[in-house]
Design a protein with these regions (language model features):
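Glycine-rich phosphate-binding loop of ATP-dependent small-molecule kinases
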Residues: 1-213
C-alpha cells in the first residue's frame, strides 16, 4: 500500500502519516528526514543535495525523486510506505509518477486532509513555545497552567514567527498556488480520497482507516 499525504501546513497530515505507518507496519517516509539522513551519511546523492541546500536553493525535482526512490527501494518499504512532504508541486508529481511507472509501480492512495484556511490560522496562531526547554502548548487545546508561562521550567512562552497569522497566511497562499493542483492530478488518476481534517485527530484517523481498509 503506497500512500501520499496531502494537506495544507498545519492540517495534521504528518501526525496522521505517523499513525498510518504504525497501524499498517509501513515506513513513514518524510523527504526532510531522507535528506538529513543522506547528508549525515555522506551519500553521493546527499552530497549533491547539500550543494543546493548550502546555497539556499531548492533541490531539483529529479534529484529529490532519486533520493526518494533510493529510500523506497529498501526492504522495509516492500509492503508499502506513507509519503509525507512530497510531492508538493505538479512537476514533482509528474517526475515521481514517471519514475514509479518505469518500475511498474504506482501510488494507491493520495489522502487529502482538508481543513479550511481560517481553522488553520486559528490552530497555528494558538501555538506557544518555550524557547528555554522546547515545550509546546496551545492556548485552547493544551494551555499552560499559568497563562504565558511554561509549566516545566517557568520561562515565558512565545508565539514563534512561523506561527504568526501573517506568516501562516503566506504559507497557505504558497500551498494553494503550488500544491492544490495536486488534488486535480490525483483525482484524474482515481486515487484521491478526502477526509475532514477539522474533526478530532482520532476521528480523522478512523476515517482514513475506513478508506484504506
Amino acid at each position: 500500500m503506497k500512500i501520499i499525504m496531502l494537506g495544507a501546513p498545519g492540517a495534521g497530515k504528518g501526525t496522521q502519516a505517523k499513525m498510518i505507518a504504525e497501524k499498517y507496519g509501513i515506513p513513514h517516509v518524510s523527504t526532510g528526514d531522507i535528506f538529513r539522513a543522506n547528508i549525515k551519511n555522506g551519500t553521493e546523492l546527499g552530497m549533491e543535495a547539500k550543494k543546493y541546500m548550502d546555497q539556499g536553493q531548492l533541490v531539483p525535482d529529479e534529484l529529490t525523486v532519486k533520493i526518494l526512490l533510493d529510500r523506497v527501494a529498501q526492504d522495509d518499504c516492500k509492503n508499502g510506505y506513507v509519503l509525507d512532504g512530497f510531492p508538493r508541486t505538479i512537476p514533482q508529481a509528474e517526475v515521481l509518477d514517471k519514475a514509479l511507472t518505469e518500475l511498474g509501480d504506482a501510488i494507491d492512495f493520495a489522502i487529502d486532509v482538508n481543513v479550511p484556511d481560517e481553522n488553520i490560522v486559528k490552530r497555528m496562531s494558538g501555538r506557544r513555545a518555550c524557547l528555554s526547554c522546547g515545550a509546546t502548548y496551545h492556548v485552547e487545546h493544551i494551555p499552560p497552567k499559568k497563562e504565558g508561562i511554561c509549566d516545566k521550567c517557568g520561562q515565558e512562552l512565545v508565539l514563534r514567527d512561523d506561527d504568526k497569522p501573517e506568516t501562516v497566511l503566506n504559507r497557505l497562499k504558497v500551498y494553494h498556488d503550488q500544491t492544490q493542483p495536486l488534488i486535480d492530478f490525483y483525482t484524474k488518476k482515481n486515487v484521491l480520497k478526502t477526509v475532514d481534517g477539522t474533526k478530532d485527530m482520532k476521528e480523522v484517523f478512523a476515517d482514513i482507516v475506513a478508506i484504506l481498509g
